[in-house]
Each structure stands twice: as structure tokens, then as C-alpha cells.
């Protein structure tokens, strides 16, 4: 593939250059589509970071990565290069711009192993000797930099003294980039590698400390881990970041990182958070700093959207690292009262649904909302979902849905979470109706509790673990009876399939994870297997679909969008405007309210377009944000399917319903 950036010259020059190169290629493809173009650029940018996905202690070290030799000597040079690696007993990755003889070479080495590090200088020496013998250069594209300073004299000989004199004239105090390109002393080739050796012992509540490598004879400090990590997984996660900076992207084709995009300061970036935890483990930062407000402030800049975990070329699990960091603080200091209330929103919702008239009046009244903000920290201006009159678990009990069936066939265990249970019982009604219409037996486990995502996002790992244990015990039994777990809430699906495995370590949580789906994905799989009823009535309207971050995080693609396109007459417009900016309890809080709106303004503005009548999304939090800046309703895809099937007569008013000032539809 040949990618031609806009700085290649005039259009005519680009065409001429491409025509000359085309005869050297086996095939060529012209792409004019934005998505395809972005794909090709992403492929070129991700080669190097992908090398850091390999498990184990060996890392791809960029010491000799930029050599160039005359193209005609490339075959012989590659043979010699392989022999050099063999003699040093080193494996390396090699990729190149073969047309002009440039190679990117990254040996895989354990930089915590001093014996291996001793090989580094002799390896570079041998490679550079061969490069210079062939008339090449040690830095063909990226400049000499720190890693090649020790070898610049070898390439330039007497001219090196001229370089030093120029440096002395313009920078007599050696303030700018000291020891880069030219140096007054011999700089070891590994002088600027980041420390990775653990100087801190880590332990769990039940395990003995994992060994560290203290510099002195003193006992190393011990960090008691709050999150479940496999052996050496924590250390590996902290050093997996290679510092490439892709997480600082502002590209509209990527989502990471919504908080960094608000204010492009380094501490907001996922990279900074990986460096923070690595510094703790290597002893550069006192582990007790994890218990301070200073480090908690940085950890709180992670809103647990999981987009960096998905889009990081090296797959660094920043959300899990930040869950550990937040949990360290909470384990020592506890939750603030306002955080506790937001984390146990199920208790507030249960109270609100029991007294729904009074609760909904309080939510829609400016004076009571002012008081609510003072007591709970929930932003006064944030539209909140109204309470239902009663909860769906009681409805399910009356309809005998809380009794498991032994009958064969497709069977679903419906996990409600908070919103479908206390705020929008009609959503649960819609899901049950759609599933039963398609011949699926529905069971609503009566012992289920909230998923605990809000608690996880705050770092209350112990409290979330208790909820996880209860849910896993209930749902695992349902799975063993032949049920597949389905939920309407993407955050709940993420908890069941991913987050609970960060809290628990047993076979049941893995069993539940393997057998859990978000409702739209489950229905789409029914359609793909030819088992979804297609007796859908037309809905003649245009809607804007937003894909939630947590739907992306569970790798379910665009199931809801594809399902909605089955409905006759329904025009689906994909609103690809990044994160909604809500991030669950983060966007509800007063202190984050304005930043939440800034992060989601692109989505809100897109929904205001006159050709869009309604919005749709799977996520409750995203729905709240989508209705924040408009009176247009945002409707769950399951409700639209139920409406199209003609299953719930009350849904006829869905498309014309309008939100209120402080309450969502």
C-alpha cells in the first residue's frame, strides 16, 4: 500500500511519483473513502506499538531501529544481520522501507536483566560496523537521538569535533538536549532506558508478597493489591506502555481519551497513568502516595470508559490499573458521603420508586434539586430519569417470571440492574415481550442486585466485590440450568463479562462471563441464525443512533444499529461523535457537569439536526446526555422493536413524547 499525505507536493507531482512507483509494486489500490483511508493510516501507525503486546519480560528495544543501507546491498545485509543476532542469542523484529534500504530493527530483550543489557552495546556495535562498511547510515529517518549518541563519532569521524564546536558556540552551558547527538562524555547505550525492576513487593489479602528486587539490603515496601491480578500480571501491566502517545489522539476516528480531549495536559492521558503505576512499582514514587489526594486526583481522570484499552496499540489495561489506584485510596480513606450515595444509587432508586409521585416531583422541582445537589453532589441542572411506580422485580414475581423453567429451548435470564428495575420498568416489559415473541423463555432471577459499576468507577472494590459475588452466584446457577444471561444495560454487561473477573477468581465468574450478552447482540445473533421473527411493522421516522463506549468495550459491534435497520420505514443515521461525555456517575456529579457537556457537545449538536426526529442508544447514561440539550426523546432499541412488533400499545406515544426541563423521557 502507498499512502500519499497532503505534503507530497502538487497533485500532478503526486500522480507522477505514484506512477513511477506503481511499476515496482505487485498491486495498487486507490481509496477515496474516509473510513478506508483512516484504516490504512492506522495500520502504518500501529506496527511498532503492536510489538509491545507480547507477554513476558522481553521488550522490543528501539536502539538500532533506524539504519539505512544502499538498497542493492539489502539482501546481503539481512543475512549478516541474522548472523549477528544468532551470535548474540537475540531475537528481533525487522521491518523496512525496502525501496530506499531503511530498516527498523528492535531486539527483544529483558531490560531488567543486567546480563542481557551487557549485550546491548556489542550488538549495536556489530550492526553499525556492518552498516557503515556498506556505505549506509546509523540514522536514516528519525535522527540520531539519545540511543545513538554513543555511535555518532563512529559514523562521522573527525567531523564529530565540528559538531561539538557548533554545539559549544550556540549552547555554551549545554542546556538544550544535553548528551543528545554530541556529548563530552561516553554515554552508555542503555543510559536512558526506563527502570522496570520492581522495588516494591505486592501482595493480596491471602497471598504472600510477590518478590521484589530492592537496591539495598532493606526490606522493600509492600503494596497490598485490592484488585485480582494473575501472577506477574500487575508488573507486566505497569510496564506495557511504550510511551508512543497514541492515547493523546484528537482524531475523530478514535475515542480515546474523552477526558484528555477536554484539556490536553499530560496527566489526563492514559500514558501518564501507566507511567504513574510503573513509577510506584519501581520505587520512583513512594507507594504511600497512592493513599493521597494528589495521586487520587490523577486516577480520577480515568472515567472507566475502556476506550484506551480497546484502541491502545499495545493493549495496556489502563482501566484496571486505575481501578487498582483508586481502590488503594478508598481502602485507606473510604468513600466520601456523596460518593457513597452515588455508588448505592439502587437504594435511592428503590426509595424513589416506592414513593414515585413525591420522588418525581422532587426531581422536577428547582428548589429540591438545589437541595439534592448540596446533599448528594448531583448537578442541579442534570436531567435525571423519573422513578417508576414500583420495581420490575415485583412485576416479574406477579407474572411468575422469577421461577426458572426446566423446559428445553432458548432460555434467557434477564439481569435488570438499576434503571430497568426502578426507573423504566417499561424497558424491561419491552425486552420480555420481544424475547417471548421470538420463542425465548424469560427468567428474572429474584436474588439479583445492582451491577456495581458506579462503585467500581469510584474505586470501592470491596463493596463492588460483595455485589459481584451475589450476582455471580445467582447467575451461574441459571447458566448451569441452561439459561443465557441478557441485560439491557451495557455497563452491566461489561461488569458481568469483564469487570467481575477483576474482582473475583473462581470458575463461576468466568462461566457467567462466557454466557452473557447485551440484549441487542443477543437478538442480532437470533437474526443471524434465522430465528428472529421479521413480522415488523413500519416506523416512518428518522433516528440518530449513538454507540455507547461500553458497547464498544464488550466488543459487540453495532448490533443495535443493524437490528434497527430491519424495521421497515425506519431511517437510521449513525452519530459518530465519540464519547457522549456522560461516563455514568462522573457526568452526574456537579464538579464534572460542565466538562461532561463539553465532552458530549458534538453528540448533542448532531441530535439537534432537524432531519432527526428521535435518538436511540442502549445506554441509560448516554440517553441522559442525549436528552440534556434537546427535547427530542431518546428511546432504547428494544422499545422500538417492541413498537414495530406491535407488542406494547403504550409505546405508540414514544415518538412524540418530549422531555421536561429536569427529567428525561
Enumerate the language-model features and the residues they cover:
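Noncatalytic alpha-helical scaffold of FAD-dependent oxidoreductases
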Residues: 1-96, 101-140, 145-206, 218-251, ...
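Glycine- and acidic
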Residues: 1-2, 58-69, 104-112, 145-149, ...
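Flexible loop/turn segments at secondary-structure boundaries
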Residues: 3-7, 36-40, 50, 100-104, ...
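Short coil/turn segments at secondary-structure boundaries
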Residues: 28-32, 55-56, 141-143, 176-182, ...
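Cysteine-centered iron-sulfur cluster-binding motifs in ferredoxin-type domains/subunits
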Residues: 233-261, 267, 294-316, 348-352, ...
Amino acid at each position: 500500500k502507498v499512502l500519499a499525505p497532503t505534503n507530497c507536493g502538487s497533485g500532478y507531482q503526486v500522480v507522477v511519483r505514484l506512477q513511477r512507483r506503481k511499476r515496482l509494486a505487485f498491486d495498487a489500490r486507490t481509496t477515496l473513502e474516509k473510513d478506508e483511508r483512516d484504516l490504512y493510516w492506522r495500520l502504518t501507525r500501529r506496527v511498532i506499538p503492536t510489538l509491545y503486546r507480547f507477554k513476558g519480560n522481553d521488550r522490543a528495544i528501539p536502539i538500532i531501529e533506524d539504519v539505512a543501507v544502499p538498497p542493492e546491498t539489502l539482501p546481503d545485509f539481512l543475512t549478516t544481520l541474522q548472523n549477528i543476532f544468532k551470535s548474540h542469542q537475540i531475537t528481533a523484529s525487522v521491518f523496512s522501507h525496502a525501496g530506499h534500504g531503511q530498516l527498523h530493527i528492535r531486539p527483544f530483550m529483558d531490560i531488567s536483566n543486567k546480563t542481557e543489557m551487557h549485550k546491548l552495546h556489542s550488538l549495536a556495535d556489530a550492526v553499525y560496523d556492518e552498516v557503515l562498511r556498506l556505505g549506509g547510515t546509523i540514522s536514516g529517518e528519525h535522527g540520531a537521538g539519545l540511543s545513538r549518541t554513543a555511535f555518532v563519532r563512529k559514523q562521522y569521524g573527525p567531523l564529530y569535533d565540528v559538531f561539538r564546536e557548533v554545539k559549544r558556540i550556540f549552547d555554551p552551558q549545554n542546556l538544550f538536549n544535553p548528551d543528545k547527538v554530541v556529548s563530552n562524555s561516553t554515554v552508555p547505550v542503555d543510559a536512558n532506558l526506563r527502570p522496570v525492576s520492581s522495588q516494591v513487593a505486592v501482595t493480596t489479602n491471602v497471598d504472600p508478597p510477590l518478590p521484589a528486587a530492592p537496591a539495598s539490603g532493606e526490606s522493600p515496601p509492600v503494596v497490598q493489591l485490592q484488585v485480582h491480578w494473575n501472577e506477574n500480571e500487575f508488573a507486566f501491566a505497569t510496564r506495557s506502555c511504550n510511551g508512543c502517545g497514541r492515547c493523546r489522539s484528537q482524531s475523530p476516528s478514535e475515542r480515546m481519551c474523552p477526558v484528555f480531549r477536554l484539556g490536553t495536559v499530560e496527566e489526563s492521558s492514559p500514558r501518564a497513568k501507566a507511567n504513574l503505576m510503573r513509577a510506584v512499582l519501581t520505587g520512583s514514587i513512594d507507594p504511600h502516595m497512592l493513599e493521597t489526594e494528589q495521586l487520587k486526583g490523577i486516577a480520577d481522570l480515568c472515567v472507566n470508559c475502556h476506550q484506551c484499552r480497546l484502541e491502545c496499540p499495545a493493549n495496556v489495561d489502563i482501566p484496571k490499573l486505575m481501578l487498582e489506584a483508586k481502590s488503594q485510596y478508598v481502602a485507606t480513606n473510604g468513600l466520601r458521603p456523596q460518593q457513597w450515595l452515588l455508588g448505592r444509587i439502587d437504594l435511592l432508586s428503590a426509595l424513589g420508586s416506592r414513593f414515585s409521585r413525591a420522588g418525581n416531583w422532587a426531581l422536577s422541582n428547582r428548589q429540591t434539586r438545589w437541595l439534592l445537589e448540596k446533599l448528594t453532589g448531583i448537578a442541579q441542572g442534570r436531567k435525571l430519569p423519573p422513578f417508576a411506580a414500583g420495581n420490575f422485580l415485583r412485576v416479574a414475581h406477579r407474572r411468575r417470571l422469577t421461577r426458572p423453567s426446566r423446559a428445553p429451548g432458548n432460555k434467557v435470564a434477564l439481569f435488570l440492574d438499576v434503571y430497568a428495575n426502578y426507573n423504566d420498568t417499561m424497558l424491561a416489559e419491552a425486552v420480555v415481550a420481544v424475547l417471548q415473541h421470538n420463542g425465548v423463555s424469560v427468567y428474572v432471577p429474584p436474588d439479583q442486585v445492582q451491577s456495581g459499576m458506579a462503585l467500581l468507577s469510584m474505586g470501592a472494590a470491596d463493596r463492588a466485590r460483595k455485589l459481584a459475588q451475589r450476582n455471580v452466584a445467582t447467575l451461574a446457577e441459571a447458566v448451569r440450568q441452561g439459561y443465557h444471561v441478557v441485560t439491557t444495560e451495557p455497563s452491566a454487561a461489561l461488569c458481568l463479562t469483564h469487570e467481575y473477573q477483576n474482582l473475583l477468581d473462581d470458575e463461576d465468574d468466568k462461566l457467567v462471563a462466557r454466557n452473557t450478552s447485551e440484549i441487542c447482540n443477543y437478538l442480532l445473533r437470533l437474526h443471524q441464525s434465522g430465528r428472529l421473527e421479521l413480522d415488523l411493522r413500519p416506523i416512518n421516522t428518522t433516528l440518530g443512533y449513538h454507540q455507547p463506549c461500553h458497547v464498544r468495550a464488550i466488543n459487540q459491534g453495532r448490533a443495535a444499529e443493524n437490528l434497527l435497520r430491519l424495521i421497515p420505514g425506519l431511517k437510521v443515521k449513525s452519530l459518530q461523535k465519540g464519547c457522549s461525555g456522560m461516563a455514568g456517575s462522573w457526568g452526574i456529579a456537579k464538579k464534572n457537569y460542565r466538562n461532561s457537556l463539553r465532552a458530549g457537545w458534538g453528540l448533542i449538536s448532531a441530535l439537534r439536526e432537524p432531519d432527526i426526529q428521535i435518538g436511540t442508544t442502549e445506554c441509560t447514561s448516554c440517553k441522559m446526555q442525549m436528552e440534556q440539550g434537546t427535547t427530542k426523546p431518546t428511546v432504547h432499541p428494544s422499545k422500538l422493536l417492541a413498537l414495530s412488533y406491535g407488542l406494547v400499545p403504550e409505546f405508540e406515544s414514544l415518538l412524540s413524547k418530549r422531555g421536561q426541563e429536569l427529567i428525561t423521557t
